[in-house]
Amino acid sequence: MPRIQVTPPPPEHSSHPQLVGDLRRELADSREFGQPLIIEEPFARTEERRVTVVWDRFARLDHEERTLVILDAYDQDQQGALPRIAVALGYTFPEGEDEGVLPYEVAPNLRSGDVVTAEQCHQAMIQLGASVLRDPQRPSLSLPTAELAKKYVDRLIAILPQSREVWTIYGNMRGACNLTFTSSARISG
């Protein structure tokens, strides 16, 4: 059987340099909370990895352009890292929820008599990067792991100390993946 080796076309680059630069800065100076959420999953037998970036700023970009933003940002951040990325996926938070990438949701479960208000809870969630794309009146704080969801609850309690009893972590096991939180908002498998 013939063996065919295909020469790849020259690489394309993103037409959104501002997003590329912002994502590159996030890669260099990862924050503990907020957007974007960067998930890096290595493949078992290679040094290649799948990179998923969940970021509401992708809302107006098609999937191909999102991939170019991710690849260009990694290329600028770490020379030589680009060939190690086998798959680069970009989602908004609602898309990540729908695709099962973010199976855990942190939400307030307010009761009458609670000291904190829904508005205070929503503002604290937005401060930590909750998405308002799906519903501006109900921020969504979805995450890839239960461990990371717990870390977000701890931070929400630090922001609103009287909210300790209102936070609930909901799990949708449909898309739960085996990821481990390592540091800041960057996840590694």
Question: Model segments located where?
Answer:
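Conserved short beta-strand edge segments in small beta-sheet-based binding/regulatory domains
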Residues: 33-36, 76-89, 131-136, 158-189
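A short interface-forming secondary-structure element
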Residues: 51-64, 141-148
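Short, charge-patterned binding micro-sites
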Residues: 40-49, 91-97, 138-144
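Short, intrinsically disordered low-complexity segments
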Residues: 128-161
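Short amphipathic alpha-helix segments
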Residues: 21-30, 107-129
